[in-house]
Amino acid sequence: MLRALGRLDGSTALTLSMHSHQVMVAEWKRRVQGAPTEGLLRKVAQDGLRIVSSGGSDWLPGSGRAEKVEGGYRVYDRKVFASGAPDGDVMNTSAIYIDPEKGPTVLHFPLPMNDPAVAVLANWDTLGMRGTGSQDVEIDGAFVADAAIAASRTPGKWHPLFHLISMLAFPLVYSVYAGIADGAREVALGLARRRPQDVIGTLAVGDLENTHAVMDLGHKAMVEVGAQAMPSADTTHRIMTLRNIVGSSAMAVGSKALDVAGGAGFYRAKGLEQRFRDLQGARFHPLRDREQQLYAGRMALGEEVDL
């Protein structure tokens, strides 16, 4: 569904993927681990609860500050790339608490978006994905009760939660980019078929088709791993390798689609310009290319994978 939606509207598809992967994680925990997440799932299904995430920008290091107070914590931070923030109901986020015994500790918790200490800033003015509403979210002393802390971990270290997120979230997120690339290919071929092609033009179409095939095969493999594997360092390795393949191939499809379309593709009304811009978002999700290559190299050498 996300790939099909991405063909038509990348921003809507990406925002939906950011909500959907959190629902999918909760459902996986309920089904596989017997975790008590049914209440959350019912709120999503029955009440239309919309979930925002700051996980991509926080990632393993975490960010923000949590100060211990009676009964919980006061949290301070500015979260970026919070897709769907203007219409979200709750944000799954984190902050770093300096534990006097354990040292820096990342705390994970849900935070209501209507909390008076939470503000969605009007600063989403970007190259692409302009319709995602991924504004910064300012958190200025929001109270988080002890009971609301869902998990804690050491900053910068791979935690089982992140292997699970990698396995489930990234096939969804990169379905969006595969869909945008599908749409770019279709537009380019439609424009190319309107005029006679010389050998150079036909070769450009063949090059586009080969690149799209690499992306398509990578995406199908990514979805298969996410559906059949169990979270682990090796599963994350496979998912992130495929994330690199799908993301780079999707961006290449966008570029080659412009070559195939010719000058007509330069006009915004043709639909390639926005797709090209939206595809650039594929480079910014973790693990970014060099981080993925480092992870892959460490896995191959049998070294510690922590970044």
Q: What spans do the regions from the language model cover?
A:
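C-terminal helix-coil-helix/basic helical segment that borders enzyme active sites and/or dimer interfaces
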Residues: R193, V214-I245, S255-F266
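Glycine-rich beta->alpha junctions and the first turn(s) of the following alpha-helix
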Residues: T126-A213
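Glycine-rich phosphate/cofactor-binding loops in nucleotide/flavin-utilizing enzymes
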Residues: A264-L307
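Amphipathic, well-ordered alpha-helical segments in soluble domains
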Residues: I180-V187, G218-A221, S249
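DPxDG-like acidic metal-binding loop motif
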Residues: R78-D115
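Glycine-rich flavin
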Residues: M1-D87
